[in-house]
Amino acid sequence: MYVVNYKQGGYALVSADKRVQAPILALIDKGCFNINVTKNDSLFLFFARKAADYVRKEITTYQDENGFDSIGVSSIEKYKNVVNTLTKTLWTDGVPFNNYCKVSGTKKRAKAGCAAIATGQIFAYYKYPAKYNGHDYLWNEILSGEKQPTTEKGKTAVAYLISDIGRLDKTRYGVSSSATNVTNVKNALNTMGYNYTYEQNPLSFVIYVNVLRSHPVLISATEKSKKTGHMWVIDGYADGVYYIEYYNYNTGESARKEKTLPLVHCNWGWGGQGNGYYLFNVFDMQYSDPHKTRATYNSNISAYVNISPKK
């Protein structure tokens, strides 16, 4: 795989093998790729490993197809079924969001946890509920800034919001990282007054229908060992259209086929770092490593879809 930095900002992850029938694996909105920074970026490494599994699967499939001798893959020529990014927040699990998140039995400030941040960003999208546990969620104040509130009232309100969600989803707090079980998020959604459907191994069509109806999706991926994982928000969609040229040297037969790539916009909950459009097939469980050479985040993909306030 190659990583391409763009002069205007942002970068792309692309396949280096023409047998992979997907010219783009990921399009990141902002920033640039720096190997010295990225080698410690678990989010990028998570996706890169999944993308490598997808590439191996595609190569195996290509070698078994149709008897064609050569193949040419175009770049993405257009997009269709585009749903622009729904959420406008770029939150992270540090200050001020974790101001009231404490390590049990201590006064040490903990990380807020990815589940609370992802859930909180969806609550902020709907500006609901108005209050809980005696805390007023001043949504206009909370949303006064993209990365964090610009007012003290907003910072206090969002810190209460994230702390309340953390208690409801039973977040286990730690100084360097915090975590919870994916199914615990149901507690926060139920208590805070939300409808939802919980699905394992969701299809890209389900994601598309949700964002088309202006419903962001909570999605999570867990490593096989179940010791690490991540929850984030999918809040946009686009089908990238490209073309494949086939040619058979023996028969002279050629064919040109239109293909589409389901690209989902991911808000990772890291202050905007890595946000962008990612090939959803990479998250699909059928593209787990066919050679079983190593463990990756290739199990326990699940999502909360059809999220909306009950009001």
Where are these regions (language model features)?
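Active-site-adjacent substructure of cysteine-protease-like catalytic cores
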Residues: 1-8, 195-263, 267
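Noncatalytic regulatory segments and standalone regulatory/sensor domains
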Residues: 1-3, 11-80, 247-253, 259-261, ...
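Structural recognition of the beta-strand scaffold that forms the well-ordered cores
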Residues: 3-5, 12-13, 26, 113-124, ...
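Extracytoplasmic/periplasmic, Sec-exported soluble proteins
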Residues: 6, 106, 110-111, 115, ...
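Solvent-exposed loop/turn segments at secondary-structure junctions
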Residues: 9-10, 20, 109, 120-121, ...
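Active-site-adjacent structural segments surrounding the nucleophilic cysteine of cysteine proteases
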Residues: 23-175
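A diffuse structural propensity rather than consistent per-protein peaks
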Residues: 138, 178-181, 203-205
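A domain-level signal for caspase-like cysteine endopeptidase catalytic cores
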Residues: 171-178, 185, 189
